[in-house]
Amino acid sequence: MIRIALVGVESMHAARFAELIASLEGKQRARIVGIWDTNSQNAEKFVAQYAPDAKIADSLGDLAECVDAAIITDRFGSRHFEQARPFLECGMPVFVDKPLTASPGDAAALVQLARERNACVLSGSGCKFAGDTLALKQIAKKMICADELHSGHLHYAADLKSPYD
């Protein structure tokens, strides 16, 4: 079983990852065993709702000592490099939810550290797997096959005043 750390649990992205991982538990593939957040109340609330068997770590270093992989879902991209660092230094794989970092310098440093430690680091968005997106994709495929759709654009609401980077 892969023991996973979840770092930064304020967003719904963390909840979705927790639900996905829990759905694999019957097969004993992976489990969230540790949580860390900048706000201990966020961590406690998250554990109660999504990961009741997980322990809340006092530090990222402590958490890195008891897991096999990490998922970083903190809302602030400017924190991602420092949050991923302890896990990468241990040579373990890390998934960083978008954005990878908030600056090109941090992104380069994160990739360099992963190379030096022979660790896997990856980042991306799970939006393409969201139910609404998948449903829209199926509708578009049918319309393309019926020669009713030749191109399109997908627009979404974005908060230009969001405090998150």
Predicted regions and their residues:
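N-terminal Rossmann-like dinucleotide-binding module
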Residues: 1-51, 144
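Short catalytic-loop micro-motif centered on adjacent basic/acidic residues
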Residues: 6, 72, 95-97, 121-124
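Histidine-centered active-site/metal-ligand motif
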Residues: 13-15, 80, 93, 125
